[in-house]
C-alpha cells in the first residue's frame, strides 16, 4: 500500500493522543513504520537501488531515536506502541 493521504490520516487517527495531534512521538513512529515497511518491500524487489536503501536506513534510525525517547519518558507508552505496531523488542 502506497503512502497516500488517506493512509496517513488513518494512521494519525489511530495513534493520536488528543484531537489535534499530528506530531506526537506515537504518530511519528507509526508513520515511519509504514514508510519503512513500504521501502523494505521496494528494496527486496530492487536490490541495486542503493539510494532507497540509504533512505530506509535513515528512517530506521529516526524511528529508533523516537522509540528511545518514548522509552525514556514512559515505558508503558513504549510497550503499547511496540505491541500495536508489531515491532520486535
Swiss-Prot record:
Top-rank taxon, per record: Bacteria
Statement: the UniProt record of this protein carries the keyword Transmembrane helix: no
One annotated Gene Ontology cellular component of this protein: cytosolic small ribosomal subunit
Coiled-coil residue windows: none
SUPFAM superfamilies named in the record: S15/NS1 RNA-binding domain
CDD domains given in the database record: Ribosomal_S15p_S13e (cd00353)
An MF annotation (GO) of this entry: rRNA binding
PROSITE patterns: RIBOSOMAL_S15 (PS00362)
Pfam families per the UniProt record, alphabetical: Ribosomal_S15
GO biological process terms on file: translation
Keywords in alphabetical order: Ribonucleoprotein, Ribosomal protein, RNA-binding, rRNA-binding
HAMAP family: Ribosomal_uS15_B
Subunit-structure text: Part of the 30S ribosomal subunit. Forms a bridge to the 50S subunit in the 70S ribosome, contacting the 23S rRNA.
Assigned protein family: Belongs to the universal ribosomal protein uS15 family.
NCBIfam families with a match to the protein in the record: S15_bact
Role played: One of the primary rRNA binding proteins, it binds directly to 16S rRNA where it helps nucleate assembly of the platform of the 30S subunit by binding and bridging several RNA helices of the 16S rRNA. Forms an intersubunit bridge (bridge B4) with the 23S rRNA of the 50S subunit in the ribosome.
Protein's name according to its UniProt entry: Small ribosomal subunit protein uS15
Source organism: Desulfosudis oleivorans (strain DSM 6200 / JCM 39069 / Hxd3)
Species classification: Bacteria, Pseudomonadati, Thermodesulfobacteriota, Desulfobacteria, Desulfobacterales
Amino acid at each position: 500500500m502506497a503512502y497516500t493521504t488517506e493512509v496517513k490520516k488513518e494512521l494519525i487517527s489511530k495513534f493520536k493522543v488528543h484531537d489535534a495531534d499530528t506530531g506526537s512521538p506515537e504518530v511519528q513512529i507509526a508513520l515511519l513504520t509504514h514508510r519503512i515497511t513500504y521501502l523494505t518491500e521496494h528494496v527486496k524487489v530492487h536490490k541495486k537501488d542503493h539510494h532507497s536503501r540509504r533512505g530506509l536506513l535513515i528512517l530506521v534510525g529516526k524511528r529508533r531515536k523516537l522509540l528511545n525517547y518514548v522509552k525514556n519518558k514512559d515505558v508503558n507508552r513504549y510497550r503499547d506502541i511496540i505491541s500495536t505496531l508489531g515491532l520486535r523488542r
